[in-house]
């Protein structure tokens, strides 16, 4: 009984309970205010109906993805009172504008440190004009150049990435930068944490940035202060506050580790035990990552520093040159192919992550193989995949057989029949696949953090590694074909037809509001 009451007390007085109660209090206050004015209900209803209609017209004319427009317009016309209030609260842009302005200024001030080597671009122009145009676009509008002299090691599962990361962290001499969406205490984080503390004692500069929502209920209260006391410089990106606001949508979904400026890790693997199968949640957890060494690491170094200084808020720029690699023995003198690490921000007008994916799809000639944990594509992605399949390209896509979110799976299933009818082959992995991979035509591949859903494509800070004619491209392909043969089941039109009417109705409703989920 003592254990029960202790557990109950922990739940009642937990940070999560406090946040839920504060959010609930705000909702109840709005409802109370509305019902207090019930004697004027007719006037209020007609006023909000007019406001809802005006907002619907305003949204219709915004330069925004049509799916977002539809997700707001339907409730504004159907339930104008609550939808109008929700719209004004959830799209309040003051906080977003402040962060956006800081982000724009920081990217502009760091641009001189991310200059494209024109010789590399000239060589690429001769070799492949399509990739050349993509590199020019990402450099000009994303702010990240493409590199040669960069090696890539591909990891098929989180366990491989973890082992390599531990090995490289132990070799750190100057600095370690970590930026992750999720950190959870357990075997994985405990081992990394121990290394970081030891390195900080040795004089290595250690910085950690983690998302305030992704790790909200996984770490103790004020955990960043504990790490600071251990010599680890730490910031929490956009700490979750119990306020109804649009800024809570913009999360730092990146996974970056940079060591001494010569080595970087990127991919889908967070710092939690399920990512290395030390804890089972949804069957076998399949994830992927890459380790890059060489010139291309600089993009990840600057990506981290940009975000760090925005969150730090002191407005002081680093002496960025101090983070250039000093140990040239770790730098490859030459390496085949081209590597482009890039980031994507929800606070600008460029959907870099989606456009890189669309470029791969539109330029594919033989095949496109994709893995994604969340399949909620917008019309542009669906149209591009359909056109590729109809034109004879082998388009295959793997999603989880065991989902981590039931409603996401329900929405994903609503796309199955449509995509299969277009010629896309869809498979489900017999576990949970968290890898975000694209590979095409034995030439190009992307491994990173960008899912095929609205949150990744439009709302989150993301990053990925684009590879062209790098040996690791063939490893990404081989991994896809291996799990396709051994661990996947193909979804057929018959499977889609067997879904119950209720299941299809739920999917249809959820799909309308999927941009807001």
PLM regions and their residue ranges:
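Glycine- and other small-residue-rich loops at beta-strand/loop junctions that grip anionic moieties
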Residues: 181, 373-374, 408
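Short, solvent-exposed loop/turn segments at secondary-structure junctions
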Residues: 216-217, 377-379, 405-406
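N-terminal localization/anchoring segments of enzymes in phospholipid and broader phosphate metabolism
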Residues: 1-355, 359, 363, 387, ...
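Helical hairpin unit composed of two closely spaced alpha helices linked by a short loop
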Residues: 374-395, 400
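C-terminal structural cap/anchor segments
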Residues: 393-457
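A short, conserved beta-strand element enriched in hydrophobic/aromatic residues
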Residues: 287, 371-372
């Amino acid at each position: 009984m003592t254990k029960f009451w202790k557990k109950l007390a922990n739940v009642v007085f937990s940070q999560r309970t406090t946040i839920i109660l504060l959010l609930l209090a705000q909702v109840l206050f709005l409802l109370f205010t509305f019902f207090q004015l019930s004697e004027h209900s007719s006037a209020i209803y007609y006023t909000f109906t007019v406001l809802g209609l005006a907002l619907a017209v305003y949204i219709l004319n915004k330069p925004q993805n049509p799916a977002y427009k539809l997700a707001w317009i339907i409730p504004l016309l159907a339930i104008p009172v609550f939808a109008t209030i929700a719209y004004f609260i959830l799209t309040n842009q003051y906080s977003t504008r402040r962060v956006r302005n800081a982000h724009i200024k920081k990217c502009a001030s760091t641009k001189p440190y991310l200059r494209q080597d024109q010789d590399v671009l000239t060589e690429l122009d001769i070799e492949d004009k399509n990739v050349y145009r993509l590199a020019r676009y990402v450099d000009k509008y994303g702010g990240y150049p493409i590199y040669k002299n960069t090696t890539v090691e591909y990891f098929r599962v989180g366990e491989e990435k973890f082992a390599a990361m531990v090995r490289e962290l132990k070799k750190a001499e100057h600095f370690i930068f970590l930026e992750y969406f999720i950190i959870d205490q357990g075997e994985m984080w405990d081992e990394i944490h121990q290394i970081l503390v030891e390195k900080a004692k040795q004089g290595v500069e250690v910085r950690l940035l983690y998302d305030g929502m992704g790790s909200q209920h996984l770490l103790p209260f004020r955990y960043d202060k504990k790490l600071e006391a251990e010599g680890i410089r730490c910031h929490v990106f956009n700490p979750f506050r119990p306020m109804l606001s649009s800024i809570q949508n913009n999360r730092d979904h990146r996974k970056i580790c940079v060591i001494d400026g010569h080595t970087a890790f990127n991919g889908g693997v967070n710092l939690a035990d399920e990512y290395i199968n030390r804890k089972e949640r949804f069957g076998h957890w399949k994830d992927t990552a890459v380790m890059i060494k060489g010139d291309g690491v600089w993009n990840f170094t600057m990506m981290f520093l940009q975000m760090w200084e925005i969150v730090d808020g002191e407005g002081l720029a680093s002496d960025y040159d101090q983070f250039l690699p000093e140990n040239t023995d770790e730098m490859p003198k030459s390496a085949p192919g081209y590597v482009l690490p890039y980031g994507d921000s929800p606070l600008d007008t460029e959907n870099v992550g989606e456009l890189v994916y669309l470029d791969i799809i539109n330029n594919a000639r033989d095949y496109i193989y994709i893995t994604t944990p969340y399949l909620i594509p917008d019309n542009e992605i669906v149209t591009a995949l359909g056109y590729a399949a109809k034109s004879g390209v082998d388009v295959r896509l793997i999603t989880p057989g065991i989902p981590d979110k039931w409603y996401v799976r329900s929405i994903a299933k609503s796309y199955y029949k449509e995509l299969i009818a277009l010629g896309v082959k869809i498979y489900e992995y017999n576990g949970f696949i968290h890898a975000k991979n694209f590979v095409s035509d034995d030439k190009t591949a992307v491994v990173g953090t960008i899912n095929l859903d609205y949150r990744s494509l439009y709302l989150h800070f993301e990053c990925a590694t684009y590879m062209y004619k790098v040996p690791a491209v063939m490893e990404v392909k081989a991994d896809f074909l291996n799990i396709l043969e051994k661990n996947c089941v193909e979804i057929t039109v018959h499977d889609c037809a067997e879904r119950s009417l209720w299941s299809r109705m739920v999917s249809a409703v959820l799909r309308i509001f999927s941009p807001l989920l």
